[in-house]
Regions:
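Beta-strand-dominated extracellular/periplasmic modules and repeats
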Residues: 2-233
Length: 233
């Protein structure tokens, strides 16, 4: 007997086409999808970029000579399966805008300053219990031109790799209480309210370091009814 895992409902994950998110109109597939056969090779397993994950890769505030501007924060949590068990040795990558809401990217030219001490990218490997931890600065909101006076809520992009690089899930983590939630078509492309809130981190006073950094918890649940919504593009 062959058991297939059920595909999650469209309400729990963003659709490929969400007209309010205007760029999906051009990017979403217009023809039936084609299944590509996967063949094994020596590059099937994770190679973590060009070298192994270093102990300091999780700290985005120590990658340059000076300390970046902005509010220092800790972001941590667990990568979990549907039964709440930690998934060990998982490559977790993040990328984000700086405290002024600007990315180090040639396409991002909106009038906000770049920070020479902040690149905005980090990576970590989950431990034996599926736990990961990052130190970074809280990203700023930024305009993005989707519609009149369009601003993205503060967020951090997450990428989670499975046992091969074709097993990659991408999502975004938001911060609690952001007033921009109701105006953001990307956040609201996940139509199930409970699923949307699984993309919102929780403030973690217990793990806040007094006098140094606030802490936010963000658990990534890979599948099941409580799965973290993932991008489908």
């Amino acid at each position: 007997m062959t058991l297939s895992y059920p595909i999650a409902s469209n309400a729990a994950h963003p659709p490929r086409l969400s007209p309010a998110y205007k760029s999906t109109v051009k990017r979403s597939p217009q023809k039936p999808l084609i299944i590509m056969r996967h063949t094994l090779s020596e590059l099937t397993g994770p190679v973590y970029g060009q070298e192994a994950v270093r102990e300091s890769d999780h700290d985005l505030t120590t990658q340059h000579k000076g300390e970046p501007l902005g509010e220092r924060i800790i972001v941590h949590g667990h990568v979990l399966d549907e039964d709440g068990r930690g998934v060990p040795n998982t490559l977790v990558e993040i990328w984000q805008a700086n405290a002024c809401g600007r990315y180090i990217h040639v396409v991002d030219q909106h009038p906000a300053p770049l920070d020479p001490n902040f690149t905005g990218a980090g990576r970590a490997q989950s431990d034996s219990e599926g736990y990961y931890r990052f130190v970074t600065v809280k990203p700023g909101a930024y305009p993005w031109g989707n519609h009149h006076n369009a601003w993205r809520p503060a967020h951090i992009h997450f990428s989670v790799f499975g046992h091969s690089f074709i097993s990659r899930l991408v999502t975004q983590m938001y911060f609690p209480g952001d007033p921009l939630f109701e105006f953001d078509p990307i956040f609201n492309s996940v139509t199930d309210e409970k699923a949307r809130m699984r993309m919102v981190s929780s403030f973690d006073l217990e793990n806040t370091q007094p006098g140094w950094a606030l802490c936010y918890r963000f658990n990534i649940i890979l599948r099941g009814r409580a799965a973290t919504p993932m991008e489908t593009k």
